Every structure is written in C-alpha cells, then in structure tokens.
Amino acid sequence: MRVAVVGVGWYGFKPVVPELSFREMMFEAAVRAYEDAGVDPRRDVDAFISCQEDFWEGVAISNEFAPEPIGGALRPTITITGDGLQCVGQAYMMVRSGAFKVVAVEAHAKPSGIVTLQEVYEFSLDPVIRTLKIPNPLFQAGLDAAAYMRRSGVSREHLAMVAVKNKNRGLLNPRAPHSAKVTLDEVLNSKPVVYPLTRYEIAGFTDVAINVVLASEDVARRFGDKHVWIDGVWWATEVGTGAIEWHEWGRMPSMKTAALGAYKLAGIEDPLRQTDFAEVEDRFSYMELLALEELGLGGDGVHRLLEQGYYNPGGGYPVNPSGGSLSIGVTLEATGL
C-alpha cells in the first residue's frame, strides 16, 4: 500500500505573528490543508497527530490543546514531542497498517512568544548536573562544527559558502523571512556567536503552523492525481543532547542509519543519481555538509563539490533550493515539514 500527501496548509512564516495565538495558527493551517486536500475533517479524517512540546508552549500537558484547533475533538488524536517529520512517519505507519485511511499531521512554532527561550535551551542541556553555568547553549554546535572541520578538512570558508548559497537562494522563496543578499566576506566577518560560527551561519527563529494530510492510495486516487507519494520512511535515535560525554562529535550516525533504511524501502541504490534534489538540516551552516556526507550525497568530498557549485540551484544536484532553515528559520517542531 502506498501513502500520499494529498493536502498541505500553513500560516505564518514570519519572525513574528502578533495577530494570532499558536492555537489560532494551528486552526488556520488546518483549514487550509483540509481545503487543499478536499476533505471534511469531521467526516473524512480518521486520526490526527500534533507535534508539540510543553516547554515551547509554556503549559504542562500541552497536548490537551491539540484536538480542537485541528478538528480532532472526540476523535483519535495523539501528540508527539518531536519534529513534525516524526509525525509524518507515524502517520505513514498508521495508514500502512490499514487501520486508518486518512491522517492529518500538525506541527507549529511561535518562538516570538516564548519569553524564556534562552532558558528553555539551557534547561534541555541539563544545567543541574552536566552543563553548569554554560553562558551560551549553542556551545555544542561550535564543538560539533570544530570536530567536523578537523576530521573532514572542511574550512571556515566552506561553512560560509553554505550560508551564502542558502541565504541568497531564499530571496526567491516568499516564505523565507531570514533570506539576505550576502557575500562570502560578509558572512566570514559578521559577528561571531560561537566558534567557528558567525551570525549568518546560525538560523533565526520563525513563527509558523503547518498541517499535512496523508491518505492511502485508494483514497488518494479519489482526490485527484497530483499528490506527493512517500516511498521510504525510516528513523534512528542517538543519545540525547544533554549526554555530551557520549556524543560522537563531528558525525551523525543516526542520520546515516535512517537514510540507508529509507533508501532501501524506496528502492534507491545511488541517491545522488536516483534523486533530483535534497532538503537537509542546515540550522547551523556546517550541518548541511555533514548531512550530505551522512546521506551519501557526496561522500568525503562534499566540500569540494560545494566549491564547484554542484549543490547550487543550477548545479548538478541542488541542495536546500528553498533556502533551508538559514533562510526560512528554525520553526521548532515544524522545521522538518
């Protein structure tokens, strides 16, 4: 049984959405997704999934806010404390099981309304035992970037080239509020945040709500034929971010494991030749290159392919043609969508 994305809706994609609460944003995105899919949530949708986290909402047991805004009142509704892409994976399995025909997936972010955003980041790193008095919670990204550079031979210029590519590409995306026309020198000489990363190499935050509707093949056919078919889904888990003593610096083995599993399901043996483009993690500039390496999209020579323009929009294999998170912004649990 194949699974398709039959509808998508969103609201926001701005650094600040002052006019609506996160629950109202969820509602607006849901209405647009159901209209795009041509479904009635009270009649056609069998289950609902929301990706959210108590710390971001500022409310304990925040899943109690999930059903009403997305049409899931008195219906099967579950919440996942993780990225929206995990919700898609869960919905995919639910549909493949045969127990559900149509599943709606929702994820949102309103970081502009989080007064203690810095403190939330600090708390996630276990400040009680492991990371006492760490002035900048982004230190892990700096350590990881430095380890990756040392292992791979990637230079500061290569990291900056990723930011230049994605920031400039985002200018063509109306949903990329952090895009900018920048040069290599401007990125390298911008304000240092945590070595080796500068301001332009760290994604900002964006308010958004996104809703995606998945359906089984037989149902999807009834809603037309212009769908996005999901051929492979896989995931793997590493140690948590707080367990820095166990982290394999400069590598991302969980991403490699997940990619190999997804490729196998989709029947892909050579991803660089059998796929046309990739949207990968880039909330920090170095992560795009590390992700490409772990995904098998260039091997150990990804930085040399970057130099040649291979990953540019007009190159042999465009990467993050949307502008990535460096242009769109970090949308908390909605980033994967």
Predicted regions: what they are:
Residues 17-19, 114-120, 171-175, 241-243, ...:
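Short acidic, glycine/serine/threonine-rich loops at helix termini
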Residues 1-23, 127, 161, 192-261, ...:
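Condensing-enzyme catalytic core mediating Claisen C-C bond formation in acyl metabolism
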Residues 19-27, 60, 85, 135-142, ...:
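Electropositive phosphate-/nucleotide-binding environments in soluble metabolic enzymes
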